[in-house]
From Swiss-Prot:
Cited CDD domains: RecA-like_Lon
GO BP of this protein: cellular response to oxidative stress; chaperone-mediated protein complex assembly; mitochondrion organization; oxidation-dependent protein catabolic process; protein quality control for misfolded or incompletely synthesized proteins
Primary role: ATP-dependent serine protease that mediates the selective degradation of misfolded, unassembled or oxidatively damaged polypeptides as well as certain short-lived regulatory proteins in the mitochondrial matrix. May also have a chaperone function in the assembly of inner membrane protein complexes. Participates in the regulation of mitochondrial gene expression and in the maintenance of the integrity of the mitochondrial genome. Binds to mitochondrial DNA in a site-specific manner.
Domain of life: Eukaryota
Protein name: Lon protease homolog, mitochondrial
PANTHER family given in the database record: LON PROTEASE, LON PROTEASE HOMOLOG, MITOCHONDRIAL
Domain Lon proteolytic: 748-932
Source species taxonomy: Eukaryota, Viridiplantae, Chlorophyta, Mamiellophyceae, Mamiellales
Species of provenance: Ostreococcus lucimarinus (strain CCE9901)
Domain Lon N-terminal, first and last residues per copy: 112-352
Binding site for ATP: 507-514
Amino acid sequence: MYATRAIARRLERHAARCKGAHVARAVRGARARTTSAPRALLDALGAGRGDADAFGTRTRRTRNAFVSSVDGDGSTGSTGSSSSSSSSAFGDSASSGGIMVSASHPSSHPQVLAVPLPRRPLMPGIIMPVKVTDEKLIAELEDMRNRGQAYVGAFLQRTDAASSASKGEGEDVFDALSAMKRTTTSVGLDGEEMVDEDEVDPADHMHDIGTFAQVHNIVRLPTDSTTGEESATLLLLGHRRLRKLGTMKRDPMVVKVEHLKDEKFDANDDIIKATTNEVVATIKDLLKTNPLHKETLQYFAQNFNDFQDPPKLADLGASMCSADDAQLQHVLELLSVKERLDATLELLKKEVEIGKLQADIGKKVEEKISGDQRRYFLMEQLKSIKKELGMERDDKTALIEKFTKRFEPKRASVPEDTAKVIDEELQKLGGLEPSSSEFNVTRNYLEWLTSLPWGVCGDEKLDISHAQEVLDSDHYGLEDVKDRILEFIAVGQLLGTTQGKIITMVGPPGVGKTSIGQSIAKALGRKFYRFSVGGMSDVAEIKGHRRTYVGAMPGKLIQCLKSTGVCNPVVLIDEIDKLGRGYQGDPASALLELLDPEQNGTFLDHYLDVPVDLSKVLFVCTANVLDTIPGPLLDRMEVVRLSGYITDEKVQIARTYLEKAAREKSGLSDVDASITDAAMGKLIGDYCREAGVRNLQKHLEKVYRKIALKVARAKSADEKLDSIVVDVDDLVDYVGQPPFATDRIYDVTPPGVVTGLAWTAMGGSTLYIECTAIDSGDGKGALKTTGQLGDVMKESSTIAHTFTRGFLELKDPGNKYLADTSLHVHVPAGATPKDGPSAGITITTSLLSLAMNKPVKPNLAMTGELTLTGRVLPIGGVKEKTIAARRSGVKTIIFPEGNKKDYDELSEDIREGLDAHFVSTYDEVYRQALDWEASS
C-alpha cells in the first residue's frame, strides 16, 4: 500500500475534524513514509510541478488515487523487456522509487466479506472511500481490522440494485478525496437472516467480477439526527481481480471467490508496445485539458518505474475516465492485457475530447466575462477622468441642461402658466435622486412638455390653383370635398391666416375618404397625421392617462403634435362612426372638447395637465353612416357627403389611376397588356357593382396577376408574346363567374309588382315590391308583410294599405277588392334587412295595381314617403338611387317634389337618358304609374 504526501495531508486534515485519533496517527505514519514522483518522468509527460499553470485554470477533479501492493502475485505477466518500451515512449528518464509502505496480505483468500458498490467499480491499485450504514457490517469490519485481516471483495451492483442502494447515499466526509472527484458510494445491507436455499441469492445483484481490496481505515461518522442511523466511512485499497463463486453467509454477506491473474503477454510485442505508448500519449493529452490528473500520475510514477507495467497502466487510464459503470466494469472484467489496453485507450480518447470541449466552452465564457469586466472598468475610469477634467457631467445635470436647452427657444410662445410648470418641474428634477421612481416620472413629464411645438406653425401653401391641381391629380370626382377645401384656402388668403376646422366626410366604403385626407394635407402643404378610432373604447386614448399610473402616456392628439413638430397639422380621425364605449369611459364624449372650435384652444390632456392649443389643427373625420354618431358630436362637425361612383366615373378612375398601379405591382410596366373598354364595363357592371372602387382595384390586380403568370410561363418556354388583350369573353378565365346578375327580375312587371329605389351601403339598388291575394271574398281585408322589413317599413305598409282602400273608392267606386281580400306584400332578397319610409308610394302603387289588375308603366321606378292624407314627402340618397335606376335600365323615375333641388345638382352624366317626374301628392304618382295610357 502506498500513499502520496498530497492525499496524506488531506486525510490528516479530515481525521482531525472527525477527531479520529487512530486515523490521524495512521495518516501521519503514511505521510512520513512517502516521497515525491520522479522528476524526469513527470517532465516527460508535461506534468511537472513547474507546469501547473501551463494548462489553464479550467480543471476537473480526479476520481481516484493509484497505489500498489508488494505481494508480487504475478498478475503482470512477462515484463522482461518493458523497459525498452518505456524508454522509446518517454526517453531515457531516470526514476527513483519512493519508500514503499508494505501491508502483508495473503496471496490467496478463498472467502471474503462482500461489499457492494452502487456505482463505480474499484480498479486494482485504486483507493476509494465507501460509506457503510449497516451496523453489523461495520462491527465485522472493525473486528477484522483489529485481527489484521481487513480484506473484502468489492463488487459493482447491477443497474437495478445500484439505483435502489443509492437512495440512502449520504454526504462524503472525505473532503480531500471528494475535491479530486473520487466516487463515494453507499452500502446499506439489511443483515437479513439465512433463508431457504430456494430463495433468490442476494449476491446475484452484484457483478461476478470484482476487486480484492484492503480496508485501510474505518472512520465512524456522527449519528444521523433525523433517522438515528449510524454510519462509517471505509478507505478501500484495490489489489487484484477476483470472481464471485457463491454465497457462504448472508449476515453480513460472505462470498466464495477465485483470485484471477492477467493472461500471459509478451511485453516486447509490437502491438502491445504501440498501444502502451498511445495510452501514455493520450494520458499526456488528458493532462493538458485537466491538470489535476497530475496527482494521480504522480502516485503511479512513485510506485512503477517508467510505466513498465502495461496492465497497471491500463487500470490507471480507466480510473482517470468519467465513463459509465458498464464501460468501467467491462475493463475490470478483461484479463487479456491487449484487450484491456484497447478498451482503456478508447475511453481515454473520449475523455480527451470531452476535456477539450469543456476547455473550449470554459475559455469562451471566461473571455466573455473578462472582456465585459474590462470594458466596464475602462468605462468607469473614462467617466471619472472626464468628470475630473470637467468634460462630462452626471446624468441628472445633463438631463436638466438638455430640457433647458430645448425649452428656452420656445419660452416666448409658451403660455405663462405652462412655463411656470416647466420651471417648477426642472427645479424638482434637480432635487431628486436618479434612483428614485419619482425621478423617472418627472423626467418623462418634462420630456413631453419640452418636446411639444409650443407656437410652432408649419409653412402652408394658400394657393388655390396648386391645391386644385393636387386634388385633381390624386382623385377623380369628389367635387364637394374639393370645393370645400378650396373655400378653406380662399378664406385663409383673404384673412391672412387660417383657423382650424372640423370636416366630416360621410360615404360608402371605397370612395376615397381616407386617401383624400392625405391629399388635403399635400394641397395645403401641411404635416399629416392619421389615427383610427374604430372600436376605441378607452377615453385615455384621447385624453391621456393620469401621471400617477405606471406607463402613463398622453393621448393621441398630444402624440400627434410631438410627432409632426407643428401646431397646425392635418389630423385625419378615421372611422369616427365606429367609436366604442366601455367601462373606461365614452370616447365620443371626450371628442366633444377636441372637436369644438370654441373649446379646443385650451384642450386639457390628463397627462400634461396644462392647456394645449389645438385651434389651428384641421380635423378631417371619416364615417360610413351618421346614424351611430352622437348628436352633440355631429352638431360640431361640418358634414360633406360622398356618393358612390357611376359606371362612367369608375371607368375613368380605373383607366387613370387603378390600372396603372396594378400593372406596376404585377411587374408588367414593359409588357403590352390591356383590357378593352367592353371588358372594363362588364367588369364594373357584373363584378364590381359597389359604390366605391376598392373591389374594382382588387379585380384589376387579379387580372394583371394572371397576365403576369402567362408572361412568366412564356419566358420559361422561350415563347414570344406580342401582346395580351383581355376582352369580355376572357373575363371568366381571369376573374371567374360574375357574382352579380342583372337587377331586373321582371322584363315586364305584372299587376301587383312595382320597382322601387333603395339606398344601401353599396350605393343604391332597385327594390321590387310584390303583392298577391291570399284570401278573397271573406270580408277580412287584412295585410301580411314579409322580406325582413324593419319597423318603419312595416308602418309604411300599414299606411299604404289604409290610404289605398280610400283612394280605390275614389278611382273605382264599385271595387271592393281591398276591403274583402287578405293581401300578402313581399320584398325580395329576404336575407337583407330593409327599413325606411321611402317605399311608401311604391307599396301603395303595388296594392292599387293588384286591386285594379293593371300593370304599371314599363321601365318605371319610384321612391317617396307617403302620408295618410296622400302627401309625398322627400327622401334621401337621390344620387345613389338615380345611379341604381340607370344601372337597371329604368327610363322613368318618380321623386318627391322636395328632392328636385337634389336631382338638379347631379351631373349631366348621371341624369342622361332619364325622364324624372317630381310629385307632391299620390294622385300625381297614380297618373304617371297606372293611368299613364290616359295621360299620354
